[in-house]
Amino acid sequence: MPFFKIEQKRLPFNHICRMKFYSYATNNTLSPNSSHVLKHSTSTDMVYIKQLYNTSCSRYKCYPIFDEYQSIYIHSSKPGVYESLIIMENGIRKGVLTYVVNDMMNYKYRVMEIVLLLYEGTDYTDLFKQINKHCRAKKIDAILCLNIGENNKFIKKFNFVPGFDTYLYMYNYHINGTLRPSDILFNFI
């Protein structure tokens, strides 16, 4: 089913979910320990990513179902545009982070918008410090995410700044009631 988002002001019909954007300036130097490493996904990671995604979906009420080609596209990288990183913890694959890069104000300000974060570990603090370090190395000025899925596990801890509301809709679809942001797995960009 086709989804669409409206930011800041809701439409005059029922939305599926009201979410909120949060941002974090990466100019803070956070010191991760060496247990987490972020590496670009490769074709050898695709089976792991698909299994992790399929296992994780059962915890959510709203998520896309990808065919093989869509999954490969979503979880591959085009440096500077979108990237998919494998989260390594002590040398073992523990998750995936997929994001897009938005260049703002004539390429003077770069923003990472998290599309999907799946993590099998428990140390979200060190993981986020590693994500921040990755952003600083890539000259990304801010991290932007919705309060969906696993993102809430670091939004509060690192004092992300709340932004505007965004509303998720589906074409020709109506539900009674709405979903909570924690019921949504994927940032439908």
Residue ranges and their predicted role:
Residues 56, 70-72, 99:
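Sparse, context-dependent recognition of short Cys/His-centered cofactor- or disulfide-binding micro-motifs
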Residues 56, 60-63, 78, 138, ...:
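Short secondary-structure junctions and interdomain/linker hinges
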Residues 63-81:
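Active-site rim helix/loop that mediates acceptor-substrate recognition in acyltransferases
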Residues 1-34, 74-75, 83-85, 89-90, ...:
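Active-site/acyl-donor-binding loops of N-acyltransferases
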Residues 24-67, 111-113, 186-189:
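Short amphipathic alpha-helix that is part of the acyltransferase structural core
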Residues 52, 70, 130-131:
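Short, hydrophobic/aromatic alpha-helical segments in well-folded domains
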